[in-house]
Design a protein with these regions (language model features):
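Conserved HGGG/HGGXW glycine-rich cap/lid loop of the alpha/beta-hydrolase fold
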Residues: 41-93
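Conserved alpha/beta-hydrolase catalytic His-Asp/Glu region
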Residues: 160-162, 180-239
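Gly/Ala-rich beta-loop-alpha elbow adjacent to hydrolase catalytic centers
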Residues: 127, 131, 135
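Conserved loop-alpha-helix segment in the C-terminal half of the alpha/beta-hydrolase fold
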Residues: 245-279
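Catalytic active-site module of serine/aspartate enzymes centered on a nucleophile-bearing elbow/loop
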Residues: 269-304
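Flexible "cap/lid" loop of the alpha/beta hydrolase fold
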Residues: 140, 148-178
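Active-site loop/oxyanion-hole signature of alpha/beta-hydrolase fold enzymes
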Residues: 84-126
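Alpha/beta-hydrolase fold catalytic core
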Residues: 1-56, 80-81, 121, 300-304
C-alpha cells in the first residue's frame, strides 16, 4: 500500500487546503473543482473559463499548487479559453497519490490519462518552472495533441549526464539558507531573491504570502521524487520550433545561474524566446498582464 503523504504533519494537512480555498475566492472567476481518479491516484483540477472556447491545460511548479500559481492569470485566460488548472500529483495541492504512485510513475502517462478522462482531444498547454518542463516534454512526445504551448520560467534543456545533479545544485543555491528557517523574514528574503522589482505580487497580498509560507513549512518535497526530469535531444528541441513560446525573466535566479552561456546556447535552436528584463521566477505573477497577453496572442494563431 502506498504511504506517500504530501504534508509534513496533520496541521499542514488542514491549513494548506484551507488557504488554497481562500486563494480560489480571489480568482474572481466561476470555478468548478474536479477530482479525476487514475492509475496513479486522484488528480485535482480547477475548471474555469468559457466552455465554448478551446481547452487550455495549465501546470504549476514543484512545491506549488494551481490555486496560487494562476491567481493573477485564470480570470483573463478564462475569457479566451476553457481552462483546466492541474494540481500535480505528489505536489501540495489537492491531488492525492494512490498505490500506483511509485518509482514507475511517468509524467506522460499521467497527463495522457488525465486528458482522456477529461474528454479533451487537441489542447493548448502552458506551465511554469517544472510545469514548463511538463509542457515541453508533453509537446515533444505528443505533437499531434498539443496545438501550441507556452513555458514560463523554464527553457528546454539538452540531455546531460549531470543535468539532475546540476539542477539540485541550482535549487540549493537559490533556496538556501532561507528555506531551512522559513520565518516571515526569511520567506520575504526568498521571495525577493526569486523575483524582480514587482515582488509585491507575493508580499502585498496577505493570503498569497501566508499560503506561500505554508507551502514552505508544510509541504513534504520528497513526495515529488517519483517525477523524473529528463533532458531532450537536439532533434526533440528543434521539433518545438513552431509550437513553443518560452517566456523567461532576466532576474530569474535559475536563468541567472546559466548566465550569458544559457542565452548563447538557446540561440542555436530556432525557438521563440522572450526575455523580460525585470522579472524573476514568479514571472506570471510579477508580469501578469503582459504574460496573459503573450499567451493569448501566441495561441490566437493556433487552430483546432
Amino acid at each position: 500500500m502506498n504511504n506517500i503523504t504530501t504534508y509534513k504533519n496533520a496541521k499542514a494537512g488542514r491549513m494548506i487546503p484551507e488557504s488554497y480555498d481562500a486563494l480560489l475566492k480571489l480568482w474572481g472567476a466561476d470555478i468548478k473543482e474536479l477530482d479525476i481518479f487514475g492509475r496513479y491516484g486522484t488528480t485535482h483540477v480547477i475548471e474555469t473559463g468559457n466552455q465554448n472556447m478551446p481547452p487550455l491545460v495549465l501546470f504549476h511548479g514543484v512545491g506549488d499548487d494551481a490555486a496560487l500559481m494562476w491567481i493573477y492569470n485564470a480570470k483573463e485566460l478564462g475569457q479566451h479559453f476553457h481552462v483546466f488548472a492541474v494540481d500535480t500529483i505528489g505536489g501540495p495541492g489537492k491531488s492525492v497519490p494512490g498505490d500506483g504512485y511509485d518509482k514507475s510513475f511517468y509524467d506522460e502517462i499521467w497527463i495522457s490519462e488525465l486528458l482522456d478522462k477529461l474528454g479533451l482531444g487537441k489542447i493548448f498547454m502552458a506551465g511554469v518552472s517544472n510545469g514548463a518542463y511538463l509542457t515541453q516534454m508533453y509537446t515533444i512526445k505528443n505533437p499531434e495533441r498539443v496545438i501550441k504551448a507556452v513555458s514560463m520560467a523554464g527553457v528546454p534543456v539538452k540531455t546531460s549526464g549531470n543535468s539532475k545533479k546540476a539542477a539540485m545544485k541550482a535549487m540549493m543555491k537559490v533556496f538556501l539558507p532561507e528555506a531551512l528557517f522559513p520565518s516571515d523574514k526569511n520567506v520575504m528574503k526568498l521571495i525577493r531573491k526569486m523575483t524582480g522589482s514587482n515582488y509585491t505580487a507575493f508580499t502585498n497580498n496577505e493570503t498569497v504570502f501566508r499560503h506561500f509560507k505554508q507551502l514552505m513549512t508544510g509541504f513534504k518535497r520528497s513526495a515529488m521524487l517519483n517525477h523524473k526530469v529528463i533532458g531532450f535531444s537536439e532533434e526533440e528541441i528543434f521539433s518545438l520550433k513552431d509550437k513553443l513560446l518560452c517566456i523567461v525573466g532576466r532576474k530569474d535566479p535559475f536563468i541567472m545561474l546559466g548566465g550569458a552561456e544559457l542565452e548563447e546556447a538557446l540561440k542555436q535552436y530556432p525557438l521563440q524566446v522572450i526575455f523580460m528584463d525585470d522579472a524573476g521566477h514568479g514571472i506570471n505573477h510579477e508580469k501578469a498582464a503582459e504574460v496573459n497577453k503573450l499567451i493569448v496572442d501566441f495561441f490566437s494563431d493556433g487552430n483546432l
